[in-house]
Amino acid sequence: MKAIHLKSMSPGVAIVTGGSKRIGRSIIRKLSSLGWKVIIHYNSNKIDALNLQKEIQKNGGYASIIKANLNNPKAAKELISKSEKKFGKLTLLVNNASVFENDSVKSLTIESWDIHNNVNTKAPLLLSQSFAKLLPKKEPGIIINIIDQRVFFPRPDFISYSSSKNSLLWLTKVLAQALSPKIRVCAIGPGPTLKGARQSSNDFKNQSESVPLGNGSSPEEVSQAIEFILNSASFTGQLITLDGGEHLDWIKSEDRNFKD
C-alpha cells in the first residue's frame, strides 16, 4: 500500500461546519492564518457568518459562507458539492456542527433523538462520504470530527447527545480504516471550553475548576490541536482529549454544583 500522507498537509480549501461561532469560529481563524481558503458553514446565524467572512477577508484571507440545515440528510449530502463551487476541491473537512440538549429516559422524544443523531452522526457520515468521493485522485485529505470528552462516560441526563457523540467516535475509527491511506480521519474531544446555553457564568466556572487540572480547554487550544493533526502525517483514527483531565475524574450528576 503506497503512502500518501508523507508530510504536513499543505493549505488548500477547507470547510468547517458550524463555523460561524464558538469553537468553529476559532478553527476558521486558525486555518485562515495557516493559509487555508475557508468555507464557513452555518444553519441560521448568517450575521455571525458574514462578520467572520469579512474579518478573514480584511486580514488578507479567502473566506466564503454557505447555509445548510444538517438536520436534513439531503442538505448534508449536497453540502460538499455545493461548497466546492466556492473555491474548488476540498481537502479538509471539519465536522464541528453539533446539537447539545439534555434529555433522560423520561423526557426523551423521537424528535430529540432524531435531531441529535441527524446532526451529530448522520451528517458527518454523509459529509465524509461526499468528501471522499469528490477528493481529487492524487490529493490526500483529512477529516476532523469535533466530539466531546463525554464519550468516556455514559450520561443518563444526556442520552441522545451522548449516544450520538459515541457513535461519531466509532465512526471516526471505522472511516479511518475505510478511507486509508488517502484520507486521515481524526477527532478532538473538548471538555469545559465555553459557557453553555443552560449555564450561568458561575456554573461554567465551577465546572472548569472541578476538573483535575483546575481548568478546561479554550477554543484556541482546540484550534492548536487542529494544526497538530494537519502536521502529523501518521496520526489517524484517534481522539485528542482536551478537558483538563475531566474524563479521568467524572463527577456524578447528583454530586455536581453546576449545570452542563
How would you name each of these model-derived features?
Residues 20-21:
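Conserved glycine-rich cofactor-binding loop
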Residues 34-51:
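Conserved glycine-rich Rossmann-like NAD(P)H-binding loop of the short-chain dehydrogenase/reductase
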Residues 104-105, 109-114, 207:
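Substrate-binding pocket helix/loop in short-chain dehydrogenase/reductase
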Residues 142-180, 192, 246:
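Catalytic loop of short-chain dehydrogenase/reductase
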Residues 219-242, 247:
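C-terminal substrate-recognition "lid" of short-chain dehydrogenase/reductases
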